[in-house]
Amino acid sequence: LGYNKNRFLYELDRLPRQWHLSVYGKGLEADKILNKEYFSYNGFLPADQLISSVQGDFGLVWDGDSYEACTGNYGEYLRYNNPHKVSLYVRCHLPLIIWEKAALAPFIKEKEIGICINSLEELDGKLEKLTVDDYFKMKSRVIEISNLLSVGYFFTKALDEAVKFLTKSDVADEGRN
């Protein structure tokens, strides 16, 4: 939560007034936070404890310097990285808000488990259009994905695909000899 990695968090004076951020983690520089009344800092919790006690309606996957986009080294890294916080938020049964250009944005869209945005400034409009029914459909899908994560479904699927690929490659290599 340090300033260099999450500078956008420290610009809460630009936060739409109906938002309230509930933040968990280490390294927050509280003296740099603007408009603290829209912000709750809950400190660090181990993953298992966070999963059972998190407060909120969405998990925000956003890093970098700016509200306008995930910029800077940390923000740009979201284009390539699959951040742990996505899985953590899913395990917490929280639909996601993620940068449109993040590596995981296509998965979020395909599974309909969150909202993809280019800028945090778009969020008000997206949330205003979201019906209660739409939110609970998203949340239900998140719970389905969470259940799959909890039993290692995605790991097993990736491992099976890797073994099939390597086995196919070995057979092809043997045919050349």
Segments (PLM) and residue ranges:
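A short acidic/histidine/glycine-rich donor-binding loop in glycosyltransferase catalytic cores
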Residues: 111-117
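A charged, aromatic-enriched C-terminal amphipathic alpha-helix characteristic of glycosyltransferases
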Residues: 118-121, 125, 132-174
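Nucleotide-sugar-dependent
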Residues: 54-87, 91-92, 98-106
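Anion (oxyanion) recognition and catalysis
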Residues: 15-16, 90, 109
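Short amphipathic alpha-helix with an adjacent loop that forms part of the alpha/beta core around
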Residues: 49-53, 124-131
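A structural micro-motif
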Residues: 19, 37-39, 68, 94, ...
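Conserved catalytic-core segment of nucleotide-activated headgroup transferases in glycan assembly
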Residues: 1-52
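N-terminal pre-catalytic "stem/leader" segment of glycosyltransferase-like enzymes
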Residues: 101-104, 172-177
